[in-house]
């Protein structure tokens, strides 16, 4: 019965994925060469419980970081909100900018902003989400095994031409300018 109360007859829906927060002209391809630290700064939710549990997918990745002397530094935005500038800075200086989805996000095909932002900030796009990989048309690395993802990403993280192509793809297809154009095309 709850479903019926939200049903609207003859109403078309428009679904839009997230995008990077950069406008196309803000992309700086020199960010590919940004000095990286042997650390990963992750600003986002990591939860061991609930519907959006994602610790089970982060744990293997974090273990491989530790085995390889890469410090994984987590900032919970709910207990310690950072400015957008600080999140960008921390991501840029990270050795990797990864997008790791939990089981529920994988199941429902959630496409977050994180991967688009990481790529636009000069990082190799890396994800465990088949839907994200599909949305980026292969312009990122994919591994369902997040422990193995660490090694795949570390090996490819200095493939600057690949990263540049991914940045160009996001610049042309995944900014809010693209989202606005998509909406306008329906009017």
Locate predicted features.
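Catalytic binding pocket for nucleotide-activated donors in carbohydrate/polymer assembly enzymes
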Residues: 7-14, 18, 59, 73-187
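Catalytic core of nucleotide-activated saccharide and alditol-phosphate transferases
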Residues: 1-69, 174-178
């Amino acid at each position: 019965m709850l479903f019926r109360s939200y049903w609207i007859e003859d109403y078309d829906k428009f679904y839009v994925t997230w995008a990077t927060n950069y406008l196309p002209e803000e992309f700086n391809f020199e960010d590919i060469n940004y000095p990286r630290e042997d650390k990963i700064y992750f600003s986002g939710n990591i939860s061991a419980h609930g519907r959006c549990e994602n610790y089970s997918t982060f744990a293997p990745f974090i273990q491989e970081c530790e085995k390889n002397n890469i410090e994984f530094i987590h900032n919970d935005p709910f207990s310690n909100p950072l400015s957008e500038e600080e999140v960008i800075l921390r991501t840029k200086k990270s050795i990797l900018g990864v997008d790791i989805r939990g089981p529920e996000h994988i199941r429902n095909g959630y496409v977050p902003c994180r991967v688009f932002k990481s790529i636009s900030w000069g990082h190799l796009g890396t994800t465990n989400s088949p839907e994200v990989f599909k949305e980026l048309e292969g312009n990122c690395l994919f591994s369902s095994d997040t422990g193995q993802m660490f090694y795949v990403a570390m090996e490819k993280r200095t493939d600057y031409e690949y990263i540049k192509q991914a940045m160009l793809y996001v610049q042309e297809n995944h900014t809010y300018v693209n989202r606005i154009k998509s909406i306008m095309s329906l009017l």
